[in-house]
Design a protein with these regions (language model features):
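Serine/threonine-rich low-complexity intrinsically disordered regions
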Residues: 2, 56-59, 78, 88, ...
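Extended, non-transmembrane interaction/recognition domains
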Residues: 2-149
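Generic detector of well-ordered alpha-helical segments enriched in charged/polar residues
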Residues: 9, 61-65, 92, 157, ...
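Phenylalanine-focused residue identity feature
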Residues: 35-37, 43, 95, 170, ...
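Mixed-charge (acidic/basic) macromolecular-recognition segments
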Residues: 125-193
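Alpha-helical oligomerization segments
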Residues: 180-268
Length: 268
């Protein structure tokens, strides 16, 4: 799974747990795998109601405390599935800052937070090459519709199954096996995400952990050699490959958002 998307998900999931629990304790999300290659992170609120000058936090805990002080009571992952430019979204996702998904902080005054990842130390001995800067601003656009957990789960099972079946027909045996393994967590009683398993707090409900694990295992949109770098074995199959890939990317993003956003399971 893309580390930038995973970090958004982790901030939302762990941030909501912190807001709903004991706020005297620190949020430990920065110690998790979504920050393992991050050298520094900064959060800057650039403008908003009653903001006379930029407000900066140097870690997630300080950011969350500032949000709470400004009346924020929940965080939401807002997935952007539309094509961000000339490249299809599932192709653009292979590049740094390729996703335009963001965090919506809701409460007394809504804020939208967008991340920018920059390589600052390309030869860092501990591989912490990235500096991440989240910029927040007041927001009135609201949250795009995100499916309920159950419907997101069903749609992603269908999309991953379609990708598996296409891979089998095209002779891509390794990819067929990849998706088959991803689908094994769909009904697991103890799901483990293939990547970033700690993005969700341990207290997360089974349905959320199962959906995130399925999304993590189904995310195949990287650089060279990834699923989105392939070409169909015949011209007639190219359109189907692109259609299946676009649907898979959309459903993965929606599934990640459904897994971490603070909706009640009884409504799904």
């Amino acid at each position: 799974m893309d580390g930038q998307l995973a970090q958004l998900a982790a901030l939302v999931a762990h941030g909501n747990e912190w807001m709903a629990g004991d706020r005297a304790r620190q949020c430990t999300v920065a110690a998790g795998t979504t920050f393992q290659y991050v050298n520094a992170v900064r959060f800057t609120l650039s403008e908003g109601r009653n903001v006379e000058r930029p407000i900066t936090a140097e870690d997630p805990s300080a950011w969350l405390e500032g949000l709470a002080e400004r009346g924020v009571n929940s965080l939401w992952l807002d997935p952007r599935t539309a094509d961000p430019g000339p490249l299809p979204a599932h192709i653009a996702a292979a590049f740094a800052n390729g996703t335009r998904s963001s965090i919506l902080a809701a409460g007394h005054n809504a804020e939208r937070w967008i991340a920018a990842w920059t390589v600052r130390q390309p030869r860092a001995p501990d591989n912490r090459i990235w500096d991440v800067h989240y910029v927040g601003s007041s927001d009135r656009s609201g949250l795009r519709e995100v499916p309920a957990i159950r419907s997101a789960h069903e749609r992603l099972v269908g999309a991953a199954s379609a990708a598996r079946d296409l891979a089998n027909r095209f002779g891509w045996t390794d990819w067929a096996q990849w998706f088959a393994e991803a689908l094994t967590v769909a009904d697991s009683s103890a799901p483990t995400a293939r990547f970033f398993d700690d993005a969700l707090p341990p207290s997360s409900e089974l349905a959320r952990r199962r959906l995130f694990a399925l999304a993590s295992g189904s995310y195949v949109f990287g650089g060279m050699g990834s699923w989105n770098d392939l070409a169909a074995p015949n011209p007639n199959g190219e359109a189907e490959y692109l259609e299946v890939s676009a649907e898979l990317y959309t459903t993965v993003l929606l599934a990640v958002a459904a897994a971490v956003n603070p909706v009640t399971l009884t409504s799904n």
